[in-house]
Amino acid sequence: MSDTSAKHIDTLLQHLGSAPFNPDTGAAPVNLPSVRASTVRFQSLAKLEDAQRRKAAGERASTYGRMGMDTHAALEQVFAELEGGTHCYLASSGLAGISMVFLSLLSAGEHALVADCAYGPVHELHEAVLSRLGIDVTFFDAKADLASLVRPTTRLIFAEAPGSLLFEMLDMPALARFAKQHDLILATDNTWGSGYIYRPLTLGAQVSVIAGTKYVGGHSDLMLGAVVTNDEAIAKRLNRTQYALGYSVSADDAWLALRGVRTMPVRMAQHARHALEVCEFLQNRPEVVRLYHPAWPADPGHALWQRDCSGSNGMLAVQLGLSPQAARDFVNALTLFGIGFSWGGFESLVQLVTPGELARHQYWQGGSDALVRLHIGLESPADLIADLAQALDRAA
């Protein structure tokens, strides 16, 4: 029998979202099946009308497949537990989740403050969509005088911590106090922590977005996002926007995410352990100027990481004193690191960050140095280190 009264998240992740027992047979599958359905039928009009009332009030209710079935409801429960929230709304990707936040909480003529370390496509969301709708955005760096940037029309602060490319730690409790002082909503992109090692809602944020594509899924085979809140009024706005704009997730992707969270505790621990071993190696290489990884003791954000996080993951960035061509040679010489933009799966990945991407980040002080972002996967760290060594030797 499943007991979800246990407090430790590792235990909860093994039991939340389990299939209920069949009342006739007393049996249940270990894994909740993927419920693929476009149409929902009801026993009576009264049952249908009750579901419609609950949905209109912002509660979880299925009246049509687009709103999600049992598989989706189970995953929403898992995300809410991960983040310490009360309501969860699914979207087809992490960026779709971010767009749900902006479109739910902002109207024409209103203004948002967005941390410059946020996920790069947020700039495209602003330029292609938000600006066209009359929503203004100001990007700020962590050292900025935020009070000077607040306008009478400012409604939202959106931050990603640690940051997307350089893993800059932000003081989330301080941002939360500032937001409360100015009557602003604080929303975060928490894909790095995914609720397992970092929980912005417990630090004062009101909304947290996770790209379940990454560490929640863990196998590089699904796409989905989740928006979690612990604020009833915000939940109603998210609920209405999710419905009105047709945000939807396939049942199979939701099922894959439920599968992924079962192994999240062991995967996250191994990613984090391997990343620190790689940092130990890289710090002694002459080509390496600086490491960006908040769990690394020399990282400027290490104290904030110790205070606010319960663990780490496989993400790090490496500043290299190499020419542009040598940096390209290094990336191309790697054999165990796939060249790609994503992360959070079982595999190791490398991304050569462009100067244009770095120019948006005030945290970057590396000038013309090269920057590579590494995702350290579940492979043997000795093999990964050997691969990095031979690639650096070839690029030198």
Swiss-Prot record:
Residue positions, PTM N6-(pyridoxal phosphate)lysine: K214
Protein name, entry field: Cystathionine beta-lyase
Enzyme Commission code: 4.4.1.13
Keyword Amino-acid biosynthesis: yes
Gene Ontology MF, one: cysteine-S-conjugate beta-lyase activity
CDD domains per UniProt: CGS_like (cd00614)
NCBIfam families (UniProt xref): cysta_beta_ly_B (TIGR01324)
Entry's Gene Ontology cellular component terms: cytoplasm
Cofactors (names): pyridoxal 5'-phosphate
Gene3D superfamilies, A to Z: Aspartate Aminotransferase, domain 1, Type I PLP-dependent aspartate aminotransferase-like (Major domain)
PROSITE patterns with a match to the protein in the record: CYS_MET_METAB_PP (PS00868)
Annotated function: Catalyzes the cleavage of cystathionine to homocysteine, pyruvate and ammonia during methionine biosynthesis. Also has cytotoxic activity toward osteogenic, osteosarcoma and tracheal cells, in vitro. The chemical basis for cell toxicity might be the formation and subsequent transfer of sulfane-sulfur to proteins, derived via beta-cystathionase cleavage of L-cystine.
Organism: Bordetella avium
Keywords in alphabetical order: Amino-acid biosynthesis, Cytoplasm, Lyase, Methionine biosynthesis, Pyridoxal phosphate
Record note on quaternary structure: Homodimer.
Recorded family membership: Belongs to the trans-sulfuration enzymes family.
